[in-house]
């Protein structure tokens, strides 16, 4: 019935669609090659976890080593941790189903409670900070809700969801879910290196903000992007739609530059060493101290004969993981216009029907009509020299490429008052304020369900599908959200079909 509606709607507007595709035909066909020579034609659950075709020789060998280290349990992880390997949170280089939707019990009144599990991983990061936005260092930047045997977790996250219904102008209903985060079972016994006594931490002195894993799609291409192009986009702006993105200038390793990596564009590189240390508790040359260094149980551990004097991850191993992330391919856009040579298939491998092709064509036009492309910029370019690994190795194969990540990598105000909270988490990172977020790259987004089995989106997983993700846009995204809401149902469904094609 829906398919019939979509086909009928497309037929009614076929002249407009044909004109749109005639104008943009060559450009749209090229979008299928999402990442130039790093494009993969792979619709399987390994679509994010496959190397680019240019990889060979010793690079291929190091990639395999990095892949193994990424997926397997990290030697020396803990004693407290959030994930036991990169892959525990980024399954198949994607987004493991997050703990914010992991049901762990219910309140006395039967209300479901979600959050930290006891299965050795939580697939989410809980940033802990004082109310002035400064990290509470003794919790090691993030809350470590998992531990090795005999060690106490730093705390457990509980999530309760509030739901609010709304409706589109045509009467169709929707529902948004708003999270309420609470940390319980705090590890309060902290070791004060000066006073040598235990002190209690008052939970009311701290606050938390939650992140679910990002997809590791297009990391190498992101690192190879011409930063001048990003800065030019920041200068552009679209005042008629209230859009004015800006760069997050970051200083890391003594270098100041345009941050691209992370939910708030808060890093200059892929943070391999930080991930091993902060998320897994694995010491390395850049972060040689245990993440729970200030905790009393570190002293207790020494009394029990536990030692922490050896680095857990070698520099060579970290470099292999860095290469692995840079050399992952990017899945092609699977649904093109009728003139493209790209196979028209869905994420499950079945052939796309003509009705669905029309829906995707209509959805792409709707994407442009809603001005989504002003922030989710379709086309960017990589600099001639490509990307540089942590050890200084150049990857020229990533250079001089035309790519289609559907992002500008800029910070945008996403609003503060939707259901009383919006997307403002009151957490600053570099120049990024609490209400500012990096535009999320959309390449590969349509394969997330195939790769990871879920469609949770946004920084904390509150959006359960594409429609909810769009409806949470506020601030600079308000105009696009309202244009989406005003569309007829067929156009809204078509826009979602288009997103599923990326």
Label the predicted regions.
Residues 11-502:
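Periplasmic c-type cytochrome electron-transfer domains
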Residues 6-9:
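C-terminal motif of bacterial Sec signal peptides marking the signal peptidase cleavage site
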Residues 1-4:
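Sec-dependent N-terminal signal peptides
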